[in-house]
């Protein structure tokens, strides 16, 4: 007859009986009693029982099997069940790292540094905005403090100094221009005896032939204007007064404001500075011509 396969219950029962027989042959209880009697100074009234023969108590310490395990015989039968292991010794401790706020912020803001053209334009916009705010604080002198960096404060002071130099040189050359125009006009007015140097509503006065000294007045006026205005242009260009004093011109302020939206406008800033310099010289010439017209009007009223 063929043997019938064993059920799971029968297999467990046979395995349990085999394990108990091996423990009986190995005298595990006697070895355990010897170990406990050697390690303890006080003997109990009852003989200790093997851990394999007694049922585990729920309040037993989990470290006791770990202390006994080195004394167990190193001989192991391949058919024995594996030793019971504490789950605390098998499972590694899971460490949860606390998030570093500074590192997270640096990663977030650092991701925008090496960006594309849009990121660079945004960086230019913010840099221009901060530069204008710092320059405005330095010129007004109302919000400047010692806690700010030295570079923006130095730039604002340099800008204010250049504006002061620009106004100072304009005032000096204005005195020279007015003195030259007045001297030239009154010299010819006093030396010419007839009415050719005066303006009059009468027809006979305008019909008179001009005196030769009238041409010398125009010659001296043109010569003085060229010499004075050329000197003004050379001095201001050499000292870079108009190139550094950007806050003194409304057009340059408009270019700076527009460069925050369209950075390409900064390429035209040197051209705008040069045109502003030319316009300053031309406005001085117009002022001298208007002064001559006013003088002729006053003379005509006097006559």
Swiss-Prot record:
Is Signal set as a keyword in this record? Answer: no
Q: Where is this region: Disordered?
A: 19-86
Name the keywords, alphabetized: Endoplasmic reticulum, ER-Golgi transport, Golgi apparatus, Membrane, Transmembrane, Transmembrane helix, Transport
Biased region (Polar residues) positions are 31-48
Give ranges for the Cytoplasmic compartment: 1-168, 237-280
Q: Which chain regions cross the lipid bilayer?
A: 169-189, 217-236, 281-301
Q: Name one Pfam family in it.
A: GET2
Q: Does the keyword Transmembrane apply?
A: yes
Q: How does it assemble?
A: Component of the Golgi to ER traffic (GET) complex, which is composed of GET1, GET2 and GET3. Within the complex, GET1 and GET2 form a heterotetramer which is stabilized by phosphatidylinositol binding and which binds to the GET3 homodimer.
PANTHER family from the xrefs?
A: GOLGI TO ER TRAFFIC PROTEIN 2
Q: What is this protein called?
A: Golgi to ER traffic protein 2
Naturally occurring in which organism (per UniProt):
Debaryomyces hansenii (strain ATCC 36239 / CBS 767 / BCRC 21394 / JCM 1990 / NBRC 0083 / IGC 2968)
